């Protein structure tokens, strides 16, 4: 008995070594096969796992935010006649509405109020909770009539109509919307702010304050035959003055045309309607496609001094063209100026351009003010003219002989030629203004001297006709002297009329804007490039996430190309590709939910759970293989006894394997010690 006990008893020193080895094995095995179900925040934090496993790659489905992307970035025509052709009426198709979390700033939005011929409404009222799109640079408000062959207005390409964080497949009456799709956008890991309260009001457009960061400009239209094959669209300048729109144009063109008509007093002052038509030579694409800050940045301007206004006819009764009674038809023609911008230096006084515009001796301002004629014009230098100004333009008259005398005549001695002056002053009476004294700040001026190769600008002639004078009379001159007028107007043309905060970008082939601008319910600190995105989830009301969006040049173009491809794949709702992507995200969320008790997918799979989006220009992500788990201590919610039984014993499988391994190791060590001893 004693000998057997001595055989089982280990030497003291050897027992210490063996015990130390056993404990090392146990601790090592414990660290390797730790029961993942009892991992707490005291071991590893989620941020540490992100840094160790995923680094800067996509780490969780919580980083995917649904964002409304506008279709205008794809280069589609945004003018009202072109946009309405993309919308059509259908019957028997129920509308569908989906929500999104953040929206992109829109350059063009639309607001429709269309009636049928019997006076009934074409479009339905918006449901409760549907509000207008809150970030629009231009709102095109269209009123009119149409056949409306159907119950609801859908998008022919299958796109959505984006409202305030709601995307619908139909158009609602009197509610501002923009065209777009809903896509998933990857955001950086945000910061949670628990102290921020839910905003009491949603963001709204600011249309009155010109200094507002979100200034919105509303353009009004009248449309007939809406929803038909051939529709007629009129741009509304005021209640009695309209412009016929017959080709694609930019909203900036309409803004400048409106300013030109008002500045030149080309508005109807009677109860009749004055409708202007545009000459084919007028280029309506004067604006630059770009996002906006306070006001629009322009790459080029509509020069009102090159526009000629001519009254064509007056209708007193309804005719074959369905013109209403008292309608005055006018035409806006375009006379391009000679390209002479290099003669107007930007770093010197504007008078220099006058002194270098084909004169052989210095021009005296005092002589012009006193009504004296100017000599010293030469024949050859007149091929180059003064840079265009809002008052005078210069052209070469081919009918004039090549040799001209050096003396010049004033306006009363050389009236404008009929070939260059198209305005009939006897027909301008229907649009004459009653108060013309405010048209020009000068009250007493002198006529401008001209040479025979130079023609008078129609604006100057029109202004003289408004004051009751003609080009052949000099009793009451209406314009200042040549030098005074040109210097002041050139100075005005050189000074920018619009505040530009960003450098002007040239139009690109696909018209992609590299800047991302997003709006959400939280608007404070609305800096360019920042996205304030509300977080909506279980027990998360009042919590807002601040995500930082960097303005990456290739990102927005890629997203818009994706939006365009997605749009073609939609049929009034998301088609198979988008549905499969949604199902994949739901599956990954379900996996994350099931595995969160054991540390999450990244904890189990390691780096194999991480992926990085491969091609931003084709799609946002090809697949999602990585989910980050936020370590929690709370057990899974009760969903039944079977689920509790499963989660109750399944989570101890790794721990049981570890314990069995330790027992086997101890028995093996005892056996080895027994054999050796």
UniProtKB/Swiss-Prot annotation:
Coiled-coil positions: 555-596, 616-635
GO cellular component, one term: virion membrane
Record site feature (Cleavage), residues: 502-503, 638-639
Lipidation (S-palmitoyl cysteine): 671, 673
Region annotated Fusion peptide, chain positions: 525-540
Post-translational changes noted in the entry: The signal peptide region modulates GP's high mannose glycosylation, thereby determining the efficiency of the interactions with DC-SIGN(R). N-glycosylated.
Transmembrane intervals: 652-672
Signal peptide: 1-33
Disulfide bonds, paired cysteine numbers: 54-610, 109-136, 122-148, 512-557, 602-609
Biased composition (Polar residues): 315-326, 370-421, 429-472
Region (Receptor-binding): 55-202
Regions of this protein lying in the Cytoplasmic compartment: 673-677
Mucin-like region: region residues: 306-486
GO BP term, example: entry receptor-mediated virion attachment to host cell
Keywords: Clathrin-mediated endocytosis of virus by host, Cleavage on pair of basic residues, Coiled coil, Disulfide bond, Fusion of virus membrane with host endosomal membrane, Fusion of virus membrane with host membrane, Glycoprotein, Host cell membrane, Host membrane, Host-virus interaction, Inhibition of host innate immune response by virus, Inhibition of host tetherin by virus, Lipoprotein, Membrane, Palmitate, Secreted, Signal, Transmembrane, Transmembrane helix, Viral attachment to host cell, Viral attachment to host entry receptor, Viral envelope protein, Viral immunoevasion, Viral penetration into host cytoplasm, Virion, Virus endocytosis by host, Virus entry into host cell
Site residues, Involved in receptor recognition and/or post-binding events: 58, 64, 89, 96, 171
SUPFAM superfamilies documented for this protein: Virus ectodomain (SSF58069)
Miscellaneous notes: Filoviruses entry requires functional lipid rafts at the host cell surface. Essential for infectivity, as it is the sole viral protein expressed at the virion surface.
Name under which the protein is recorded: Envelope glycoprotein
Organism listed in the record: Reston ebolavirus (strain Siena/Philippine-92)
